[in-house]
């Protein structure tokens, strides 16, 4: 059978079950208010990961512009050839200081960081233990590593302990999201750290959604839990969310970072981030550490939204993060609600399996410090109207 016919069959199958994904073309910069191709009016976006609203900050843009004038657009090669600029190096040092760790290492994307770390540290004869709701990049890293792959029930440390007790692997790595990207809840890091120590395992935390939003000065979930390098030897963070730029990093000991420079194939065999992105991230890191009002405002908006949903009897997940999903169940219902919200001026993406478990399609609502109280109030009013309308449609079927 030809490639074309096989792929057409796959695409048709996805369309038939409401799993076909498509892109929308933005006509304006990423922000709270966006113009989108096919829409006659501006949409208020409640689906971005720009949690602190730094992506369009004038100081971040200026840092990027100045560095681009000096370094040009591309880095030219990998970090180990001639692509490692002073901007990269200084950003790594500043991220290490920010996380309170001896060293940090930049990666081009969060996906590459997770793949590189897990594959660099594990192989045949080892074992990796992952929360069932971990991000795809963590799961893929574990599957490709060749290590024995275990998945424990979400935030269930007893289940994890049972798996660890049975393992005879030479190296054992526990891997979790700090804040789970689709549910918005946090990992039980204190219990996980205790389990790791008890069973002589290593703990890796992907705090992509915690950095900037949680902990003292936005230092993340690990910091919020009072854990140290000894508890969490491998800490990963992304730069494309609260930092508002692009890329990722891993922070840890001198030995860990030197080992990853040698062993992480996704670091060794790829072009370095543009120096201008590193310069912009240095500016956003400074803002993240000094403009505390952004986190304070974001947290106030989160509480406003959760209180409003409670008043409307809309059930939310147990999340205190900017990620506030409303689980709707069926894929078609989630798509319908997303469409109706767009008609009322809101851009909220419907998230469907396999990104989330079967039967848990949802609106993944995310809040930003750039939103206003009025934006959230308008969102709640629109949700109330749409949910009444959809409920009536379902009852009449």
UniProtKB/Swiss-Prot annotation:
Reaction equations catalysed: 6-carboxyhexanoyl-[ACP] + L-alanine + H(+) = (8S)-8-amino-7-oxononanoate + holo-[ACP] + CO2
Functional pathway: Cofactor biosynthesis; biotin biosynthesis
Residues modified to N6-(pyridoxal phosphate)lysine: 241
Listed EC numbers: 2.3.1.47
Record flagged with keyword Nucleotide-binding: no
PROSITE patterns (alphabetical): AA_TRANSFER_CLASS_2 (PS00599)
Binding site for pyridoxal 5'-phosphate: 110-111, 181, 209, 238
Cofactor(s) of this protein: pyridoxal 5'-phosphate
Keywords carried by this UniProt record: Biotin biosynthesis, Pyridoxal phosphate, Transferase
InterPro entries hit by this protein: Aminotrans_II_pyridoxalP_BS, Aminotransferase_I/II_large, AON_synthase_class-II, AONS_Archaea/Proteobacteria, AONS_Proteobacteria, PyrdxlP-dep_Trfase, PyrdxlP-dep_Trfase_major, PyrdxlP-dep_Trfase_small
GO MF terms held by the record: 8-amino-7-oxononanoate synthase activity; pyridoxal phosphate binding
One GO term of the biological process aspect: biotin biosynthetic process
Enzyme class: transferase
Chain residues that bind substrate: 21, 135, 355
Keyword Electron transport found: no
Signal peptide region: none
Binding partners and assembly: Homodimer.
HAMAP family in UniProt: BioF_aminotrans_2
Protein family: Belongs to the class-II pyridoxal-phosphate-dependent aminotransferase family. BioF subfamily.
Functional description taken from the UniProt entry: Catalyzes the decarboxylative condensation of pimeloyl-[acyl-carrier protein] and L-alanine to produce 8-amino-7-oxononanoate (AON), [acyl-carrier protein], and carbon dioxide.
Name recorded for this polypeptide: 8-amino-7-oxononanoate synthase
Organism of this sequence: Saccharophagus degradans (strain 2-40 / ATCC 43961 / DSM 17024)
């Amino acid at each position: 059978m030809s490639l074309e016919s096989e792929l057409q069959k796959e695409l048709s199958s996805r369309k038939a079950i409401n799993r076909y994904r498509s892109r929308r073309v933005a006509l304006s910069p990423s922000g709270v208010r966006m113009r989108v191709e096919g829409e006659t009016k501006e949409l208020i976006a409640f689906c971005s990961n720009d949690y602190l609203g730094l992506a369009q900050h004038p100081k971040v843009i200026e840092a990027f512009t100045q560095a681009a004038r000096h370094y040009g657009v591309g880095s030219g090669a990998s970090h180990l050839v001639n692509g490692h600029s002073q901007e990269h190096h200084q950003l790594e040092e500043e991220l290490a200081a920010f996380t309170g760790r001896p060293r940090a290492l930049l990666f081009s994307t969060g996906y590459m960081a997770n793949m590189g770390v897990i594959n660099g540290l594990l192989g045949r004869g080892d074992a990796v233990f992952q929360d069932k709701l971990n991000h795809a990049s963590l799961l893929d890293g574990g599957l490709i590593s060749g290590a024995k792959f275990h998945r424990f029930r979400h935030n269930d440390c007893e289940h994890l302990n049972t798996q660890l007790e049975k393992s005879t692997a030479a190296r054992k790595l526990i891997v979790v999201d700090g804040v789970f990207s689709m549910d918005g809840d946090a990992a039980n890091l204190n219990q996980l750290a205790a389990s790791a120590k008890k069973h002589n395992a290593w703990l890796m935390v992907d705090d992509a959604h915690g950095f900037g939003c949680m902990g003292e000065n936005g230092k993340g979930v690990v910091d919020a839990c009072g854990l140290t390098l000894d508890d969490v030897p491998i800490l990963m963070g992304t730069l494309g969310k609260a930092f508002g730029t692009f890329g990722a990093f891993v922070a840890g000991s001198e030995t860990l970072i030197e080992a990853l420079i040698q062993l992480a194939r996704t670091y060794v065999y790829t072009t370095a981030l543009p120096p201008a992105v590193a310069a912009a991230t240095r500016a956003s890191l400074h803002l993240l550490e000094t403009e505390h009002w952004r986190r304070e405002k974001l947290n106030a908006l989160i509480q406003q939204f959760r209180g409003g949903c409670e008043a409307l009897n809309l059930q939310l997940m147990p999340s205190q993060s900017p990620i506030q999903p409303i689980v709707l169940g069926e894929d078609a219902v989630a798509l319908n609600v997303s469409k109706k919200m767009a008609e009322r001026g809101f851009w909220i993406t419907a998230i469907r399996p396999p990104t989330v478990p079967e039967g848990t399609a949802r609106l993944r609502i995310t809040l930003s410090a750039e939103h206003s109280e009025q934006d959230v109030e308008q969102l709640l009013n629109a949700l109330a109207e749409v949910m009444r309308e959809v409920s009536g449609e379902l009852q009449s079927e």
